[in-house]
Amino acid sequence: MAIPMANFTKLNREACKASIMIEGLTGKGKSGLALMLAYGLEGGFQEHDDNSDRVNPWEKVFTIDTENRSLNLFIGIPASWGGTFGQFYGTQLTSEDGYAPSNYLYLRDAAIKAGAGVVVSDSVTHMWTAKGGVLDKVNDVKLKNPRMDNYRVWGEPEVAAEKQALIDVIRDHRCHIITTVRVKEKFDMQYNADKQKNEVVSIGEQQLQQEGLKYEPDLVLHMVAPGSGNPQKHPRAKVIKSRYAIFTEGETYEFTPQLCEQLRQYLAEGVSIETLLEQQRQDYIKAVTEILNNNTSAKTIWPVLKEEAGVKNAKLSEINLTVLKQLYSQLIAD
């Protein structure tokens, strides 16, 4: 078979779609920041000639609401940037529908078909913990197969399919994706030497979501303080993880219109998707290494899982991203 003539062209950087996750306690302003970012990514804070004919950025914002229509409450209220939240498109996902990740995917694809430039899912906690979510599916499999260990439950086709859908919800090459996720405060019992008694103390916060999901987005923000339109106050969030050069991990940022516009411009200038995916693969390699170094049972089952995944003789550094995600999910299942 003859090889067709190769046509090589000089490659350019291409615009990249955002993949952003915002975590925080209830009332910390996750939804408000998500809407502000969505507005900004669609050029809401871009300088324009007053006479220019442009599409209202809110017309490109589509939302998937699992929080009892809480997003509706933002429409028309004063925003931190001095304007008001506009009217955007939205749909509600309820317990009657079921919170299966595949349902989120269906709604996201419908939004894109309808012209979405940004899809906000508020929140994705439900597709992990609520009715029809991944944990619900896992429990169904365990009830049918009570002797099956956790590692293999997560490898079952019906579980694996929803787990993959959960990951797919986080990013899409066709539009910007912003997700919110709830966190809970973790507590522990510690001895107070001064008072000579045990006390309950806070030891931080934890996402109400599958542990590895934090490796999927390119930017993960933790809410520090909500924004307000009256009095005017910009939301603040700490960068937990970033693959975007304009942010520094561990730093807390005030999300002003200028910062949102800087993010839009950065993505518009182009970020290599191959670079982002390789950074994601390295995140998973680091996470798997940590598990194997600190979990004896995981280290024991690791060779078996590798063989079942078809990478028996591969070094960890040689395993591709798709297989790494599958192996990671099985390792943290126990």
What are these regions (language model features)?
Residues 1-24, 28-35, 39, 48-56, ...:
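Interfaces that engage single-stranded nucleic acids at replication/repair/recombination sites
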Residues 14, 29-30, 99-103, 158-162, ...:
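Short, glycine/acidic-rich beta->alpha junctions
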Residues 17-21, 60, 117-120, 176-178:
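Residue-level preference for the first positions of well-ordered beta-strands
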Residues 25, 56-157, 161:
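Conserved inter-motif catalytic segment of the P-loop NTP-binding fold
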Residues 27, 160, 167-258:
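Phosphate-binding/switch region of NTP-binding enzymes
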Residues 39, 112-113, 171:
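Residue-level signal for alpha-helix termini/capping positions
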Residues 43-44:
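Extreme N-terminal leader/anchor segments
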